[in-house]
Amino acid sequence: MPHSKLDDLPNAVDRWPMIGSAGYRTVKWGDMEVGLTTCEALDATELYKHGGLPGGVCPCPHYGYIFQGRIRAHYPNTDWPDEVAETGEAYFFPAGHVLIYEEPTRALELNPAHALQMCMDAMNRAIEKRLAAAEPAEEAKAGS
């Protein structure tokens, strides 16, 4: 059976480049993905929306534990109240949420790999769109 120390999980900066080289470590075991996220404060609302996720929400349920920090799960277009998990707490956020890392956070997550891949792909599409939109503006600025 697979096992690993958290800091020995493979670096996956290519999967989530916006949080930096040490910010995301992950490995797929069977149909689950084990990930260690270390990030600054981050609101994923625009990433989910501009990345093309249906309804602008994450399709992946997240099971995790927060070593440090605070994560808010917001459930747009529902009557569900926001949920907050913070240092020392285990959590479950069902699909249909937007994650907001309210402060620097270090969290372990166990997620269904396919659903997480859809979320990661959408965030990367949003980043690519943002960068592509910035390039013409930079060129116009340089040409003036």
List the predicted regions and their residue ranges.
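Short, conserved beta-strand element in jelly-roll/cupin
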Residues: 56-73
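A short, polar/proline- and glycine-enriched secondary-structure boundary/capping micro-motif
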Residues: 46-49, 83-86, 118-122
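Double-stranded beta-helix
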Residues: 100-144
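Short acidic-glycine-tyrosine-enriched beta hairpin
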Residues: 77-96
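A short, N-terminal "cap"/entry segment at the start of jelly-roll beta-barrel domains
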Residues: 1-47, 54-55, 83, 132-144
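Residue-level recognition of conserved beta-strand positions in structured domain cores
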Residues: 38, 75-77, 95, 101-103, ...
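Structural motif
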Residues: 63, 70, 96-98, 104-106
